[in-house]
Amino acid sequence: MWLVRHGQSAGNVARDLASASGRHMIDIPTRDVDVPLSELGRRQADALGRWFSALPEDERPEVVLASPYVRARETAARICHEGGVVPGAKGPVIDERLREREFGILDRLTTEGIRQLHPDQAEHRALLGKFYHRPPGGESWADVILRLRTALDTISLHHADRRVLIVCHQVVVLCFRYILEEMDEEAVLRVDKEGDVLNCGVCEYEFEPDDERECVPRLVRYNLAAPLIEDEQAKVTAEPDVITGTR
């Protein structure tokens, strides 16, 4: 199973501009769900598709699942278009449980904007920590994990013994790691603190039977940038999503 964060989006670019200029709001003219890939993000997705296509056919994805957010759907579609899956592969199948973490009243605010416009939320987050803090109308990491557990149950039920590619978002990748590697809060936040998940970076798991013949996930690689480094049309980016806050 592969977990891939979407390519660079127009929202990633807008967030950087807003933060650099000290603005409180991120200038995005659409809903977060409708934010597309940037031109670089499209090249990143194409490069990743070509990287998958270079694998032997019996090592390529057989099923592609994607978040309903446009940037994830575009990434998944471009990977498939570049031949990154087996012929006749299923998908991209859209699953709303793979969507971005919902930020509620903090949506489109920069870190400085949160401090200035919602100081109570900044204080509450500092007290609870980013794992459990749930902004009004939004989700905590723990909330995201709850829906991802059900998504994994569905994958096990309908796609057992198939190679599955999941195209999603930064926090979703980290929350999948939390579940699959049986992490605790401290462990997953330590991974997060090491740096952002790369746009189109590859996280790969193999599932191997244990002594009780249950399939146990083993992390093969995390945040692999090689597909982008090897392609002249793309470059590596690791920009935070629209709202992340301090680590």
Label every model-predicted segment.
Residues 1, 101-115, 178-247:
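Acidic, low-complexity terminal tails and accessory targeting/binding regions
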Residues 1-7, 166:
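Short, hydrophobic/glycine-enriched beta-strand segments
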Residues 2, 11, 16, 43-123, ...:
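Phosphate-coordination/substrate-recognition cap region in phosphate-metabolizing enzymes
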Residues 6, 41, 169:
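Short, conserved phosphate/pyrophosphate- and ester-handling motifs at nucleotide-, phospho-/glycolipid
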Residues 18-45:
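Short catalytic helix/loop segments, enriched in acidic residues and glycine
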Residues 28-36, 122-142:
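Short glycine/proline- and acidic residue-enriched helix-loop micro-motifs
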Residues 55-59, 155-162:
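Glycine-rich phosphate-binding loop signature in dinucleotide/nucleotide-binding domains
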